[in-house]
Amino acid sequence: MAYPFQLGLQDATSPIMEELMNFHDHTLMIVFLISSLVLYIISLMLTTKLTHTSTMDAQEVETIWTILPAVILILIALPSLRILYMMDEINNPVLTVKTMGHQWYWSYEYTDYEDLCFDSYMIPTNDLKPGELRLLEVDNRVVLPMELPIRMLISSEDVLHSWAVPSLGLKTDAIPGRLNQATVTSNRPGLFYGQCSEICGSNHSFMPIVLEMVPLKNFENWSTSMI
């Protein structure tokens, strides 16, 4: 989860988020090198006497500044495309959970179980217990097994929503009449928080998401108690 005055990304909890953080560092380094080169050229222009003012063309320079940007774009595009394909790939999910966005709460249905479904509302600030997080706690958490691929089917009952959990690298639009899917895989147990990331009305800020990732045995005990 995020902390006050945090400057970086949240700790990665899934393979996809780890890839996204590596891609972020990769792209940031390229941007840093380009910015340094531009600043260096500007400083030379400001401190050096202008020469070759009558030169009309320079084939070598034009070739370099055509090929070099193309190479840089390829270095950015290839890792990006790889991650996009990884995010769309779902191999043998052990569990499918259907998520529906409403104004202004989420509902969940475990399609592999009969009658295992519930609504998840934000806990009002006045009802929070000591240590609980304002605007992030819910009355019913989404309990899922860790270290296993889980398919999330995401849609909306009314307006556009977006189901997002940053530490897992997840952000999928919930669109009325359309069923989107995403893969959830957590490397470790714990509570992972997210929020609706699409402005959906006056209470848009009050649609938190809480995933509780637990070992498989604990998940089986929880699902048995819920049915």
Swiss-Prot record:
Residues 1-14, 88-227 are mitochondrial intermembrane. Component of the cytochrome c oxidase (complex IV, CIV), a multisubunit enzyme composed of 14 subunits. The complex is composed of a catalytic core of 3 subunits MT-CO1, MT-CO2 and MT-CO3, encoded in the mitochondrial DNA, and 11 supernumerary subunits COX4I, COX5A, COX5B, COX6A, COX6B, COX6C, COX7A, COX7B, COX7C, COX8 and NDUFA4, which are encoded in the nuclear genome. Residues 46-59 are mitochondrial matrix. InterPro entries: CcO_II (IPR045187), CcO_II-like_C (IPR002429), CcO_II_C (IPR034210), Copper_CuA (IPR001505), Cupredoxin (IPR008972), Cyt_c_oxidase_su2 (IPR014222), Cyt_c_oxidase_su2_TM_dom (IPR011759), Cyt_c_oxidase_su2_TM_sf (IPR036257). Mg(2+) binds at E198. GO terms for cellular component: mitochondrial inner membrane; respiratory chain complex IV. The gene is MT-CO2. Belongs to the cytochrome c oxidase subunit 2 family. This is Cytochrome c oxidase subunit 2. The chain crosses the membrane at residues 15-45, 60-87. It is found in: Mitochondrion inner membrane. Its main location: mitochondrion.
